[in-house]
Each structure stands twice: as C-alpha cells, then as structure tokens.
Amino acid sequence: MNKKFYITTLGCPKNTADSMSMHHSLLEEGFTPATFAEESDFHFINTCTFIQSATEETIQTILSAAQVKKQNHQKLVVVGCFAERYPDNISSEIPEVDLFFGTGRYAQAGKILREKFPDLSPPKREFNDSLLEKLKLSSEIENYSKPYAYVKVSDGCNRGCSFCIIPSFRGKFRESPVEDILRDVDRAIRAGAKEICLVSQDTVYYGRNSEVLLDMVRKVAEIDSLEVLRLLYLYPDKKTEKLLRLMGETPKIAPYLESPLQHVSSKILKSMNRVGESSTFKDLFALAREVKPGLEIRTSFIIGYPGEEPGDVDQVLRFIEETRPEKVNLFSYSPQEGTKGAELKQTVSEKEKSRRINLIRDVHLAILEEIHESRIGQTYDAIVDSVENDQAVVRRFQDAPEMDEVVYVDDISLIPGMIGKIRIDSFYEYDMNGTWISK
C-alpha cells in the first residue's frame, strides 16, 4: 500500500528546514513523497503567522487545499506556527483539517500520522541506518533539486522583542548539537547542494558565547565539498561583530550580511525591547564592508510601531541615505495578540503606515538605482539556480536564495549548481540581466 505525502511550505527559510525534518520523518515511517499536492494522500501545510499578512496567506492556503481535498479524498494536515497559535480556531472553524500539530513535533510527523490513521498508513518498514540514510539522500536529490539548502542551527528565541509572537509558540532558544548540524550539511551537499544557508530565529545566540558560535561556523566552512556558506539572521550585537571578522577571514562565507534592525530610533528600539542605536548600527555596517570587500547588506524595518512619530521615520530615512543598504525589507506593524506591543495604544493609522512605508521605499529605490548603475559592467561570483523559459536564473554570491535579486542570462547551456563569473549588463527595478563569462 503506497501512501504519498506532499508538503506545502509557507513563510521563511526556517520553515523550509522544518519541512525537510518532517519529510525525513515521513520517509522513516514508509510514506512516499508525491510530486504534486493533488496526487498525495496526505497534504501537509507548514504554516506561518509572523505578521497579519502571513496569517491571512496561511488561512487562504488552508481553505484552498480544503477544496482540493474534497475532490481527491485526501487528508489535510496543518502544522507549524499557525497550528501552535490557533488550535481552537482550527478545530471549530476549519473542520476540513483532519490533523494539526505545532512547531515542536516536525521530527515525529511520520509517527503521528501512523498513530492517527493506522488504517491508511503503509506497512511499517525496518531500515538499518545505512539504508535509511540512502533513502533520505535519494529523496532529497529527487525532491529538492535547487543548488542550495537550508540547515537549521537552533529553534526558539530568548530576545523578547515586544512586537514578536514567535517565542510564545517556538519557545525558548534551543540549539542543535554541532554534530547534527554537520550531518545535515553533509547530507545536503551529497544531495547536490553547492550552497548551505545556516538559519534560525537568532543565529548569533548560538552557544551563548562567541567562541562556540565561531567554532561551529568554522567547522561547517571546513567541509571540503562545500562551495558557499551563507549566514542568515544575524542579530545586531557584539557577537555579530566577531562573526563578521570570521567572515572576512573565510573565503567560503558569502559576502552578505542579513541583519534585521527593525528600527533605528532609540525611543522605538527601547519600546521594542531591542538593543542598539543608529550609531552602533552604522559601525556594524561599516565593519562588514571593511572586513569583507564586495559585501552587500540586507536589513528590515518595522514601520508604524506604537509611538512612532515623523521624527522617528526621518531617522530611518537618514540612516538609509547614509549607510545605503542594498536590500531593505519594510513591514507595516501589525499588533500580535499576546505581545507587549499589542498592549500599547496604536497611535499610527493604517493609511499613515502605508504613506511612511512608501516614502521610505521611494528613497531606497532611488539609492538602489544608483547601486544598479554602478554594477553595470562589473563581474561577480555567481551560482546558477535554475534554467527555465529559455533563460538561466543566476544569483550573485551577494544575493540570498528566494528573497534577493537574480540575474537573467540568455544561455540555456548553463546547468543548475554551476559556479562561475557573471557580468551585469542591465537592470530592472530589482533584478538584472547579465552574461555568463566563466564556466
């Protein structure tokens, strides 16, 4: 009895890593991955509820899957952040959901499914460690064909930011043993990944002290078959400075800093329960560019937080104009029930939030156009992500997969995973066109 599963993943790269853990658990219990959701017996939706728009996308995805379920006689399984946060709502308002569980049980997904649906589960198969590893590896090769992979180094968060609901359902910070991280990296590389992205809610908190964090990163970078190592979500504190210096000493680490600042006004940062100030953030960005030539920066800001005034927005504008981060993500603040921020008087209207975001975006787009102009004729180390519609989709090492710019190349002879040099020829608002000049 061949029972197939399919996993739809919403949200951030951390969810992608969790879906892989769930994928492996289902393989261990004898379930088979489906190529399409419509042909699966069990459709899993790994959800996101970080902000209101993510929650709305999750609900719409579940409702759409519920319609498909009726036609295909599937079981619909909702997992992750939304299931952890709103279990009562799922039970009472979405009866089409056959099973749901939260963020701490991804690695038990196969056993949970077998216990809940014993009559619909495949026969239990016994694997020795070697055979199981081969099965997981071959499944990754078949189902995760991109030349990059996400490896999670921890879960949960101890920061206590007043706008963030994640600790309430992800829990306190828990790090993965170095041995587990190295195993996951090795498996991803053997499955074809050329680039490894280390992800977590708070990567720099790993090990609680700088040396443990640096030692973990060094061990990953020392893996001979690894081509590119990318570090994601670096909280802007003193440990990040030490990590940046290691990046400068380690050629394999991508010239890329992702550090979500969320704001630069000291007043708003204090209300958000975050550390740092505009001057320390400027120093951090300057250090990153000093120790890693060619490095590009991705950051984010939450606009419209309670108490934010025009002067606070001006500080964000001045910061962007002075530091010129290449990639800026802007979020409209949405109060999350159960957070300290939601208890504050909401002083900024939705219309005003949109106006402020548009103002900041226009300023950054003007800067980005100048940055794009400076890229014309320049060459960059790059990796081929895919070939589709008679074009290759290429990504500079300065750009992270799935969230940053790509370069389109009219060369279908390129192969996903190929690493070489690309010349930038022209640009759009965000993405670029280029020529592959080295194979």
From Swiss-Prot:
Domain TRAM: 373-438
Listed cofactors: [4Fe-4S] cluster
Source species, domain of life: Bacteria
Enzyme Commission number(s) of this protein: 2.8.4.4
GO cellular component: cytosol
One annotated GO biological process: tRNA modification
Binding site residues for [4Fe-4S] cluster 1: C12, C48, C81
Binding site for [4Fe-4S] cluster 2: C157, C161, C164
Functional summary from the UniProt entry: Catalyzes the methylthiolation of an aspartic acid residue of ribosomal protein uS12.
HAMAP family in alphabetical order: MTTase_RimO (MF_01865)
Protein name in UniProt: Ribosomal protein uS12 methylthiotransferase RimO
UniProt source species: Leptospira borgpetersenii serovar Hardjo-bovis (strain JB197)
Organism classification: Bacteria, Pseudomonadati, Spirochaetota, Spirochaetia, Leptospirales
